[in-house]
């Protein structure tokens, strides 16, 4: 074994040792932060709206976790779904019906359950924001990917062909 390879081995070993020694402190710090971090409310108004326009009605549905539910903002019309509906109404001069179906703490698995419980509708555009809570709950990537495929299949059930847009997984 050369001096250089021994040096790399020792540095790697020291890294694991430091992580092992710091882990209990980091774990306790995480528990403390979870207790003291401010919990922001979701908007208190109705999570749907209708924007008047001409021509065929455009149906928009927003699904997901806290980022989609509007945590920390005053009105659902200021959520990603509400703002998308407003902009499409302005650009296309069509009536837009929009609805937000989102909850704090949802994972891809619980989102799939929520989708199964909803009646099938003729939605034209579905916006999905999911993944942050899966990261916190340490969902394995292969399980997340499998459940994401199930999500798309559930959204397209009954022969529907909505445009489904996924936002990137939030940086956590």
Predicted features, each with a name:
Residues 116-172:
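Alpha-helical cap/lid subdomain in secreted, periplasmic
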Residues 72-124:
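Membrane-embedded segments
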Residues 70, 100-108, 132-143:
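Surface-exposed cleft-lining segments at the edges of enzyme active sites
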Residues 1-61, 91, 121:
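N-terminal secretory targeting modules
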Residues 59-61, 99, 126-128:
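Conserved beta-strand elements of the Class I
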Residues 63-64, 101, 167:
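Short hydrophobic segments within beta-strands
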Residues 2-12, 16, 103-104, 110-114, ...:
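Extracellular glycan-modifying ectodomains
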Residues 56-74:
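Catalytic nucleophile-elbow at a beta strand-turn-alpha helix junction centered on a G-D-S/GDSL motif
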């Amino acid at each position: 074994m050369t001096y250089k390879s021994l040096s790399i081995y020792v540095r790697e070993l020291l890294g694991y040792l430091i992580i092992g020694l710091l882990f209990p402190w980091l774990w306790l710090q995480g528990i403390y932060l979870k207790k003291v971090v401010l919990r922001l409310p979701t908007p208190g108004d109705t999570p749907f709206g209708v924007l008047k326009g001409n021509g065929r009605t455009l149906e928009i549905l927003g699904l997901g976790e806290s980022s989609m539910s509007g945590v920390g903002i005053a009105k659902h019309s200021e959520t990603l779904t509400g703002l998308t509906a407003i902009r499409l109404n302005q650009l296309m001069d069509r009536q837009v019906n929009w609805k937000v179906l989102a909850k704090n703490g949802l994972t891809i698995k619980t989102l799939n359950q929520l989708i199964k419980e909803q009646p099938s509708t003729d939605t034209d555009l579905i916006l999905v924001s999911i993944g942050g809570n899966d990261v916190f709950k340490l969902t394995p990537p292969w399980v997340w990917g499998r459940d994401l495929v199930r999500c798309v299949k559930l959204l397209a059930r009954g022969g529907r062909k909505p445009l489904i847009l996924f936002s990137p997984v939030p940086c956590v």
